[in-house]
Amino acid sequence: MYIQKIIRDNIKTALNEIFQFNTDNIELQQTKKEFEGDVTLVVFPLVKELKSSPKEISEKIGDYLVANSSVVSYNIVSGFLNLLIADEHYLSFFNSVKEDSEYGFFDTISNEAVMIEYSSPNTNKPLHLGHIRNNLLGYSMSEIYKAAGKKVYKTQIINDRGIHICKSMIAWIDYGNGETPASTNLKGDKFVGDYYIKFDQVYKKEVEELIKSGVTEEEAKQNAPILLRAKEMLIQWESGDKDVVELWKKMNGWVYEGFEETYKNLGVDFDSYYYESDTYLLGKEFIFSGLKSGVFYKKDDGSVWCNLTEDGLDEKIVLRADGTAVYMTQDIGTAVQRVKDCPDINTMVYTVGNEQDYHFKVLFLILKKLGFSWSENLFHLSYGMVDLPSGKMKSREGTVVDADDLMQEMTSTAKEISKSLGKLEGLSEDEKNNVYSTVGLGALKYYILKVDPKKRILFDPKESVDFQGNTASFIQYSYARIQSILNLSLIHI
């Protein structure tokens, strides 16, 4: 505490001037409720060194502090010196905090930086409620590290390749009729997400028709015509087919524009971006070097594995028999690439849902076995799912709660409640809209961040905007009431 630091320094000065004694062993604690005071000095550790009674030491230090510091009075209880701090000190402290725009921030304490990964969405649909929790956790961690004096790199890896984006592309080719986000007045990510939903609808219908024709359910799911076309498109993309790559770039571009709008509204940002299309081939060189050093081994079919059974984990494939990479290969390469890009990185934090807990245990252990010293400072910021009262979100069925829709709902809910309370008289429409946004998004952020990340959340929009209880709305309302009282008083703070 700030006050304890000041009192500690005052006590050290008192000991030096009264007893000619220097020490850093000064034990302070908050005064117990049953006694009068704000801060308590535990005197017993000083008795042996000063060769005086606890009462005599307490009186001399207490008298000195009353004469030379912000202490206005003291009392002694069985070797505990209880100190009462002057009200003027707190007023002075509050004023200094008000004038210090960076109160609570530390200067940069080292040249070692932290990289924090968060968001990392797929490019086939808009961000949803789960992404909101991810972004708020990752961004908050970044700001906390900054305040603690660390240099921070905020990054994400965008999952911009694979069968999921090909599904949206196939559906757009079949049913898009040349439409664009601009022509339909839709955000780009929402526009592309609608075609992902369309693909799933067509896919399910084709599966049903195949089953009716006598094909087994498993065969139908694997051989639905639209799915086979999406798989073929992925092969074309990987071979660099010009038309496929151009469409891929165009549709991903629409999605990125939509993402940026969502990030802006949520109040988060990034310093750098990594794309899976650039990183999915990274890591192979480390698999080959790991083979030579004995970290990995090759099975008869040619696939490469890491045996982690002695570490309490399972065997993990790191390269397929056909030589293609798996996600673990990519993550190994991406981690190394990030350190190359930012050599001052000492710590990396991955903000990813708890369904990936095992993946990160394996990743961190493999990087350690490969001999990367920075692997000791890798951390998985794991978090639980977010549900709404209506149930778990499912993007393929079009029942996902989009982040944009939820933020708009929060603003609308705040508007409804604020109007019912009748506290906005005299404000312009712009000022009212600013209040609605501040209250609504503040409620969303606080409701999510107040919960232990490891716990699953049942998010209730109306409950989060309640002006009673442990909510952002209550805190904001309390702040506004305090400001109103101060404005009506003669005290200037």
PLM regions and their residue ranges:
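Phosphate-backbone binding interfaces of nucleic-acid-interacting proteins
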Residues: L50
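Accessible peptide chain termini
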Residues: M1, I491-I493
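NTP-dependent nucleotidyl-transfer catalytic core
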Residues: N16, F21-L41, P45, S53-I491
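Generic start-of-chain signal for non-secretory N-termini
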Residues: M1-F21
